[in-house]
């Protein structure tokens, strides 16, 4: 009987230690349970997400699925609570945040360029000034051999061919970045078209998603449009040098996109990087964000699901994940932005208690 009592005490002691350890390291024990995370939204960062999602699944066993349905779709999916997190290139402004079912946070994940892509076989190195961009996209310049284009591109044999503007037909963060830039460089654009995820276009034809716009430009000689840089590089579509705020013509590159983010980043990371004051910056650059609810206990959502979500996002802004960005022509987050993202993630709760320490 004495031996049995001692054995019982020993078992109780180890059980208590194990219990205490699990409470202290609840995040680790919960993370061992395999879950599936579902996300949807922006097509702008989709090549990067597809790559790093596979890496994370291989390393942890956590399954991730992503639907590239545009930033507008990503915001709607989070609003309807049909995804673990949404993705958008256009941050939610104060009015939109107030309309959401509960508090939403933004996690920047990568930096990218919206390039001006065109299809003129054999004619590389096109330079587009602010004035030319305005007149082309407002429909005032309709031919590639317009005198203003020729004057700005000495040495290029621009053809007598109609310009066909290809734009997005769906709600798009890429459109938001592009139109935010256009609104900064052109009062005419700001007054008549403005900025947004969906616009009333003065000219052009629509295509769905970055893949749709890229494909249409590639198939249409004389076409011009705006797409995420990776889509242009992957399909070998020509891109223009764009005039920045210092008057310099800059190509989209990892370096020139990173230069656009040299300014101060606010604590909530909601900032547009277009038309940066840095003289070496590519002017149509931007963050892309993951959005999620700050309180994760909603609609019967389990703590395991919530913990898996924030653990993945914590990894996504880590050096390991950021180090993969350049493989698909994105720029990694500046150190300051990554640190702010990690701080924001530590505010995410389940039943009011932080999920990450």
Where are the model-predicted features located?
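C-terminal motif of bacterial Sec signal peptides marking the signal peptidase cleavage site
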Residues: 13-16
